[in-house]
């Protein structure tokens, strides 16, 4: 029999173990939904409390922050300044000059760049099931959705797309010309057309819409009203234009323009979701990364480099008082000090001095927050060696709510404390120890 070195548990499994070991739920009795809900609350309480308890090595990652000339404060988190995890952070250079309004760039390499994924999980053109006939159009399938006029009507077809209000989407399609003179393609907010194009020859097209509601409609409609004339929707794709890699381009004016990768056209060509706002010369820096960092609980091991490929220089951590007492917070030069304030929203990183060039970067280790669990099927965000401590800690946390007797509660709390201590003993970053004489004589 094959064996594994990984022992994984779901939230529901660890909650059930805790309930049974605490003698709250008998072995022969099924766990009820309300008990799972209580267990999820306890699991989240325990995991968030544990964030105060040590290093948690598995929650540490190295991050890269491109600096902005003269900027003294950076927001770190999902809605903060562009900042990615180092293992998914890529750099390249422009291989051809770009001008304002360009959306397609030629670069040395598109390695690591991820284009916006198709939201549709299955082909929309292999069945008429999710399509709705418009104006008596007859729908069939033959190398796509075939729209046939019924009588003297310009027949059409609608396809509903789930959306998030405020998000901008690209609806892409391939049209095969039939006997109809052409076809009108549109995206609609209810009955309001937000974007439209008419094609009279086989081609691919793209429509853009910023969703004002949670359902939008793609419509294809023949331009001809002659009975029996046809058009075919051969392909349909649907993307959130801001779901690809973040991409930053150094502009000649000394700033960094940020957008999202829409398409990776080739090994050296990339299309962005928005046009650059200024000129960029051959050799200018290009950054890309997939995952914006989460709000860090802590920062440490920070280094500064004059460029992404330059040598890193360790920089010193300041206290809040040391930063606030610095009289000239806007002076530019080499960054030598930093202070981090982990606010409840995006965290705030203060640097001194401020960057003197748009190619300057900081790197630092971040400690991420533990996951919040909302379903019993969620995989636990803990290494194997923490599962025992987690089980007993959940049991101890649930005990008072279920009226566990005092002597049993003491046992649960003792087991929880001992298991957590053992787990924390294993959760440390062993390094060098330096001994030096005490020259002060104290």
Model features per residue range: what roles?
Residues 1-99, 104-105, 110-117, 240-442:
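Glycine-enriched, solvent-exposed interface loops adjoining structured elements
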Residues 78-80, 88-91, 95, 104, ...:
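Extracellular and organelle-lumenal recognition/adhesion modules and their flexible linkers in secreted
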